[in-house]
Amino acid sequence: MTTSPVKVLIHGASGRMGKALLRLAAEDDALHVVGAVVGRSPSQRVVDGVPYFAANELGGAPAFDVAIDFSLPQGFAPILALCVQRGKPLVSGTTGLDEAQRAGLLQAAGQIPLVWASNFSLGVAVLTELVERAAGSLPGWDCDIIEAHHVHKQDAPSGTALTLGEAATGSGAQPRFASVRAGDIVGEHSVQFTGLGERVELIHRATNRDIFARGALHAAKRLLGKPPGSYRVRDLVL
């Protein structure tokens, strides 16, 4: 018995992550991209067999099983609303969301399964757990989170740095942040715990953006069939 491919809608398809998602999804027989949503009216309506839609045409997107969103904060509310309206899961890696948008996520989680994360790599999922353990085991130590990304990344600190900070804070640390924007750095995060005469440093370096796209695609598959709720990446990939 063959299983039909999962129908995926990619929102934010013109960005770095969107392009990686399209390329990797095309290599996966278990996935079928039914639509790609971009900010402005596309110059081509169909590219490599994938229909393209402008953001203001989102309501006319074809039927899908799960949506994956890597866009900008101003484009987040419409894709969240569409998933709620159609009762479909959402995987989102859009960073820079404000408090109202985060509240909207929590409200939507009562109706659909969703996962929002600043980083979908397996390594960062493990790093987050290690930060929690280190912060709880090293009370009173200084905690510093240093992140570095390419010059075009707008938000700082990065969403991943903030997520790591939340993990540290939840275990009693008081993290400080520093950001670097330089060249074409894909993503580097260092969490340092410094005490008297010693320092613990936890580091994750991404050398290829594909790790994030693969993680998001894997999370999308795992989210199918889940009851409504807000899931963590580690719940789906570890």
Swiss-Prot record:
Reactions catalysed, as given in the entry: (S)-2,3,4,5-tetrahydrodipicolinate + NAD(+) + H2O = (2S,4S)-4-hydroxy-2,3,4,5-tetrahydrodipicolinate + NADH + H(+); (S)-2,3,4,5-tetrahydrodipicolinate + NADP(+) + H2O = (2S,4S)-4-hydroxy-2,3,4,5-tetrahydrodipicolinate + NADPH + H(+)
Source organism, top-level taxon: Bacteria
Cellular compartments annotated: Cytoplasm
GO MF annotations in UniProt: 4-hydroxy-tetrahydrodipicolinate reductase; NAD binding; NADP binding; oxidoreductase activity, acting on CH or CH2 groups, NAD or NADP as acceptor
Functional pathway: Amino-acid biosynthesis; L-lysine biosynthesis via DAP pathway; (S)-tetrahydrodipicolinate from L-aspartate: step 4/4
Keyword Oxidoreductase: yes
Transmembrane segments: none
The protein's Enzyme Commission number: 1.17.1.8
Binding positions ((S)-2,3,4,5-tetrahydrodipicolinate): H150, G159, T160
Residues holding NADP(+): R40
Active site: H149 (proton donor/acceptor), K153 (proton donor)
Entries under Gene3D superfamilies matching the protein: Dihydrodipicolinate Reductase, domain 2, NAD(P)-binding Rossmann-like Domain
GO biological process: diaminopimelate biosynthetic process; lysine biosynthetic process via diaminopimelate
InterPro entries with a match to the protein in the record: DapB_C, DapB_N, DapB_N_CS, DHDPR_bac, NAD(P)-bd_dom_sf
Protein's job: Catalyzes the conversion of 4-hydroxy-tetrahydrodipicolinate (HTPA) to tetrahydrodipicolinate.
Family membership noted in the UniProt record: Belongs to the DapB family.
Name of the protein in question: 4-hydroxy-tetrahydrodipicolinate reductase
Lineage start: Bacteria, Pseudomonadati, Pseudomonadota, Gammaproteobacteria, Lysobacterales
